[in-house]
Amino acid sequence: MDDPKKIIVALDYDHIDSALTLADNLNPDLCRLKVGKELFTKYGPEIVIQIQKKGFEIFLDLKFHDIPTTVYKACISALSLNVWMLNIHLTGGLNMTQAAMRAKLDCESSTKLIGVTVLTSLSDQDCHNIYGCPRENELLRLKDIAIQADIDGFVCSPYDINILKDSTKIYVTPGVRFGDDKQDHHKAASPKEALDLGSNYLVIGRSITGNSKPNEKLEEIISSL
């Protein structure tokens, strides 16, 4: 797939005014925006609606992880907002993942449903401590869940794409940095590196949101690809 809008700008703010101000300074023809738990917990659907009114497609990053019935109902509610993309935690298991996909089918939704694999904040030692196995083993287990449930793709480190590779899936990579600090992502990469490794969509936050001219920075990143 070759979607020209490869960049998803992460709205990592604690106030709606900051998020809307950034949206006013970005071109919706060049990117999509990610609304995460911080903004959504505080403002609910209103933040999604306000940003959509500005012409942006939304990746609703809530990482649902609960019993199948609860996740099904949560997905139904989220899909009613007509978001472009929605995610769940694949560690919730096959039944939960199938429930999320069933919600999408029942809504006849075109929203992309993707699964979070191993968080980019986790080191290899963290993976051993949490999963009791190497990172690669856990990734393969989660890949199997995603394929069985037939979801649309993965949230993963660009360095994990080779392990998760499947021609029918899309790959969304957080922790992408353009010449700045990696923050708490152990598996960060530059935008060009992430695309070369097989990513379809790049989640970029501070590199753009922390710039005084965010749209110029966005255009610079796009040119670098």
Segments the model singles out, each with a brief description of its role:
Residues 31-85:
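Metabolite-binding pocket within alpha/beta catalytic cores that recognizes anionic/polar moieties
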Residues 25-26, 51, 78, 146, ...:
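Generic structural signal for hydrophobic
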Residues 3-5, 66, 70-161, 167-168, ...:
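Conserved anion-binding
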Residues 81-93, 178, 187-217:
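Glycine-rich phosphate-binding active-site loops on the catalytic face of alpha/beta enzymes
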Residues 23, 48, 75, 97, ...:
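Generic hydrophobic/aromatic pocket-lining and core-packing "Φ" positions
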Residues 8, 34, 59, 84-87, ...:
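Conserved beta-strand positions in the central sheet of alpha/beta enzyme cores
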Residues 9, 33, 63, 86, ...:
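Conserved, mostly hydrophobic/aromatic
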Residues 28, 54, 81, 149, ...:
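Structural motif
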